[in-house]
C-alpha cells in the first residue's frame, strides 16, 4: 500500500512538473474547420466553443441508408487543473433522412442527438524548435530547414461515448474512445496534424480511423486546409476529402467554412459546413521567481513581509492601531480670571 502511495505521489509530481509549461495562446486556437484535433490544450482559464452548421448529401443505396443530414456540431473545450490537460465535450444534433429502397423507394425523417462524447487529452511531448532569427553570422544556417520540425508533438486522448442519443445512433452501451494526436510545425505558416482513433470499443459498431490535415496560413488572419479522413468499419469504409477557409475576426473569434467530397461504401456525395469558434478568456499567467542558477526562490523578502502582515489578528489589531494614530486630541483651554 505504501509503495502504491509513493508511486501515485511521484506520478502527480511528474505531471505537475510537466504542466508548468503553458499552452495558452494570445489568439484563439480552434480545430475547425477540420475534423482533426490538435494535441495542444486551450490552457487554464479558457472556455472555448467551436460550432459548425453542416449539410450532408449522398445517393440512396439499396435497402436502408441515411442519404441526407442537416445538423449542428458543438465542441466545448476547457482546462481546470493543468495547462497540458484539456477536458472537452463533443455533441451533434441533426435531422436525418432515412431511406428504404427495394422495388419502391420510401423515406422518413428522424431528429435528435447523434453524438455526446466526454473526453480528455494530455500533451505528453512538446517539440521545441531553434529560433533562426537569432542567427546573424550565416545566411545559409538562418534559412536552412530545421529537421527537428519533422518530429511531432504528441498527445493522448481518452473519451467516453454516452448512449444519450437518438434511436438510430444507439449502441445500447457506453463505449470508450482512445486516440493519439500528432502535430508537426513544418514552418511558421505550415503544419500537419495527424490523428489515429479507435472508437466505440467493445461494441458491434467499433471503428478505426485516421485523419491527416495540412494547414497553411496566408496571413495572420486567413488560413486554409486540406484533409483526408478514412474510417474503417465492419460493414463498409468511409472516406472524405475536404478543404476550406478560416478567418480570424479577432483574438477570440474565428469564422470558418468547409466543403468535402464523400465516399461512403459504394455511394458518393458531398458535405458543406459553416461555423464560428469563440472563447471566453479568463487566463491568468503564473510567474516564478528564480535565482541566478535558475532555481525557484520559494520565499522572498516581500513574501515574508506579506506573511507577517497577512495574519488575521495582525490585520484585526492594526485597525485599532491606525485609529489611535489618526485620532487627534483637542488642546485643553485654560480660562484665566480677569483682574
Language model segments and positions:
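Bacterial Sec-dependent N-terminal signal peptides
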Residues: 1-28
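Transmembrane beta-barrel domains of Gram-negative outer membranes and organellar outer membranes
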Residues: 23-201, 205-339
Amino acid at each position: 500500500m505504501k509503495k502504491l502511495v509513493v508511486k501515485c505521489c511521484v506520478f502527480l509530481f511528474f505531471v505537475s512538473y510537466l504542466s508548468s509549461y503553458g499552452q495558452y495562446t494570445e489568439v484563439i486556437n480552434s480545430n475547425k474547420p477540420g475534423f482533426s484535433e490538435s494535441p495542444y490544450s486551450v490552457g487554464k482559464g479558457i472556455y472555448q466553443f467551436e460550432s459548425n452548421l453542416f449539410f450532408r448529401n449522398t445517393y440512396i443505396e439499396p435497402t436502408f441508408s441515411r442519404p441526407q443530414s442537416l445538423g449542428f456540431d458543438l465542441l466545448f473545450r476547457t482546462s481546470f487543473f493543468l495547462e497540458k490537460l484539456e477536458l472537452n465535450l463533443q455533441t451533434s444534433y441533426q435531422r436525418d433522412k432515412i431511406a428504404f429502397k427495394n422495388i419502391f423507394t420510401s423515406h422518413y425523417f428522424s431528429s435528435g442527438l447523434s453524438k455526446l462524447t466526454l473526453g480528455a487529452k494530455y500533451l505528453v511531448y512538446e517539440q521545441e524548435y531553434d529560433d533562426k532569427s537569432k542567427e546573424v553570422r550565416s545566411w545559409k544556417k538562418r534559412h536552412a530547414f530545421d529537421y527537428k520540425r519533422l518530429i511531432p508533438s504528441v498527445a493522448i486522448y481518452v473519451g467516453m461515448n454516452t448512449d444519450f442519443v437518438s434511436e438510430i445512433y444507439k449502441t445500447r452501451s457506453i463505449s470508450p474512445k482512445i486516440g493519439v494526436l500528432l502535430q508537426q510545425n513544418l514552418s511558421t505558416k505550415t503544419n500537419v496534424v495527424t490523428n489515429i482513433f479507435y472508437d466505440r470499443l467493445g461494441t458491434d459498431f467499433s471503428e478505426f480511423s485516421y485523419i491527416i490535415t495540412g494547414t497553411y496560413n496566408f496571413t495572420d488572419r486567413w488560413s486554409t486546409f486540406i484533409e483526408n479522413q478514412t474510417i474503417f468499419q465492419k460493414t463498409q469504409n468511409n472516406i472524405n476529402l475536404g478543404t476550406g477557409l478560416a478567418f480570424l475576426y479577432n483574438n477570440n473569434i474565428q469564422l470558418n467554412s468547409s466543403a468535402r467530397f464523400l465516399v461512403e461504401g459504394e455511394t458518393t456525395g458531398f458535405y458543406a459546413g459553416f461555423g464560428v469558434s469563440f472563447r471566453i478568456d479568463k487566463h491568468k499567467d503564473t510567474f516564478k521567481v528564480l535565482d541566478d542558477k535558475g532555481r525557484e526562490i520559494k520565499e522572498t523578502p516581500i513574501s515574508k513581509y506579506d506573511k507577517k502582515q497577512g495574519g488575521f489578528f495582525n490585520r484585526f489589531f492594526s485597525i485599532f492601531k491606525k485609529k489611535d494614530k489618526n485620532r487627534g486630541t483637542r488642546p485643553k483651554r485654560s480660562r484665566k480670571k480677569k483682574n
